[in-house]
Regions:
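Proteolytic cleavage junctions
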Residues: 40-81, 89-102, 107-116, 124-342
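Bacterial Sec-dependent N-terminal signal peptides
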Residues: 2-11, 27-61
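Sec-dependent N-terminal signal peptides
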Residues: 12-27
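Intrinsic-disorder/low-complexity regions
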Residues: 3-11, 17, 184, 190, ...
C-alpha cells in the first residue's frame, strides 16, 4: 500500500509541535518549582533556642561577685555604683545563720540597652491584671551562695541605687520579678511589710564618688532575686492596641520585639503576645498612647549571628508596624544604637 508522503510529513509536524509544547511546559513547571524551593531556602531561619541562650549568657556574664563575712556583714558596691548593705548574721541556710565567707552575686541595670541584652524589660503586671510599661530607676539581681549551697536572707538587706544629680532625682516604688537569675516574670509591686501598700523607696542624699552632692533611692529586700525601682508610666489621653508585623520566617518562638519610648531612656516594653492566626505581635491591654513617639526593636539570632531592626514611629489609632528584614550586627553595636535612641 502506498503512503501519502504529505500526510506523513503533516503528522510528524503535529507530533513535533505537541512534543515541543509539552517539553516547554515541563521545563517551566520544573523552573517554577526550583524557583519556589530557592525562595523557601532563602528565607531566614532564626534560632529561638540560640536567642534564649544569648539572653541567659548575658545574665551570667553580667554577674559581679563579692566575698562577704556573713557573721559580721558589710557593704558591697557594684561597678555602676549600687550598694548593698548586709546586717550581721543576716544570711542563712535552712533558717540558721551561716558563718565564714559567702559569695554575693549582683547584677545592676540602669539603661535599656542592658535591659534588652538580658531580656529584662520594664514591663509590669498591675494588681488588676493589666500590663503596662514602667519607668525604671534601676534593676537588680541579688543572690548569695556558700560553696554549692543556695543561701537565704534572714534579715532584710538594703539596696541603694547609684547616686544622681539632685535635679535628675525621682522617687520610685519597689517591684519584684522572680528569684532565679533566669526568671522572665513580669514586674509586680512589692509589699515587704505586708501592709497592703506598695513599698516606696526612701530618698537619701550623700556625697558622690566625684565629691559632689547626690541623691539616691534605698529600699529593703527580704529575699534574694530580682528587684526593681520603678513607677508606672501613667500616661493620660487616648490609648490604642498595637500590632507588629514581622518578616516571613519570624514568629513568637524565634525572635523578640521591644518598644522604647522617646524621652524615657529607662523604659523598655516587650511585645509579649504572638497571634499565630494573624501572625502579628501585640501586647495585652492597649495601653499605648496615641501620638507617642517610639522606636520598635526586633532582635533575632541567625546562624550564630545577632540580627536586628530598629524603626522609628509615632503611634496612631489601631497602629500596625511592619518591620523591615533584620540585618546582622554585634551585641556592642546594637547596644550603642539603643543607647543613642532619644
Amino acid at each position: 500500500m502506498k503512503t501519502n508522503q504529505n500526510s506523513v510529513n503533516s503528522l510528524n509536524k503535529i507530533l513535533f509541535v505537541n512534543f515541543s509544547k509539552f517539553a516547554l511546559g515541563l521545563t517551566l513547571c520544573i523552573g517554577l518549582t526550583l524557583t519556589s524551593c530557592k525562595k523557601d531556602n532563602d528565607l531566614p531561619t532564626p534560632d529561638g533556642a540560640a536567642l534564649t541562650e544569648f539572653f541567659e549568657t548575658n545574665r551570667e556574664e553580667s554577674l559581679q561577685t563579692f566575698t562577704l563575712n556573713a557573721t559580721t556583714g558589710g557593704v558591697i558596691t557594684g561597678s555602676e555604683g549600687t550598694k548593698v548593705v548586709f546586717q550581721p548574721n543576716a544570711i542563712g541556710l535552712n533558717g540558721n545563720p551561716v558563718t565564714g565567707n559567702v559569695t554575693i552575686q549582683l547584677i545592676e541595670l540602669y539603661d535599656r540597652s542592658g535591659m534588652l541584652s538580658l531580656n529584662m524589660p520594664t514591663y509590669g503586671s498591675k494588681p488588676n491584671g493589666d500590663h503596662e510599661v514602667l519607668k525604671s530607676g534601676g534593676e537588680f539581681f541579688l543572690n548569695a551562695i556558700q560553696g554549692s549551697n543556695q543561701l537565704e536572707l534572714l534579715i532584710p538587706a538594703e539596696i541603694q541605687s547609684r547616686g544622681v544629680n539632685p535635679a535628675d532625682f525621682e522617687n520610685f516604688q519597689v517591684f519584684r520579678a522572680g528569684d532565679d537569675i533566669k526568671a522572665t516574670d513580669l514586674w509586680e509591686e512589692a509589699d515587704e511589710d505586708g501592709d497592703g501598700e506598695t513599698d516606696d523607696a526612701q530618698a537619701r542624699d550623700g556625697q558622690g564618688t566625684a565629691g559632689g552632692f547626690v541623691m539616691y533611692n534605698a529600699f529593703d529586700t527580704s529575699a534574694f532575686g530580682w528587684t526593681n525601682l520603678d513607677r508606672w508610666y501613667n500616661y493620660t489621653g487616648a490609648t490604642t492596641q498595637l500590632y507588629v508585623d514581622v518578616p516571613a520566617g519570624y514568629d513568637g518562638d524565634n525572635c523578640s520585639v521591644y518598644l522604647t519610648y522617646d524621652g524615657e531612656p529607662t523604659a523598655l516594653a516587650r511585645m509579649d503576645i504572638y497571634d499565630e492566626d494573624t501572625e502579628l505581635f501585640t501586647e495585652h491591654y492597649g495601653r499605648i498612647p496615641v501620638g507617642q513617639a517610639v522606636h520598635f526593636i526586633l532582635v533575632a539570632e541567625i546562624d550564630g549571628v545577632l540580627h536586628y531592626t530598629i524603626q522609628a514611629a509615632t503611634i496612631v489609632n489601631g497602629h500596625t508596624e511592619i518591620m523591615a528584614e533584620p540585618q546582622p550586627t554585634t551585641q556592642s553595636q546594637l547596644e550603642t544604637l539603643i543607647d543613642a535612641l532619644p
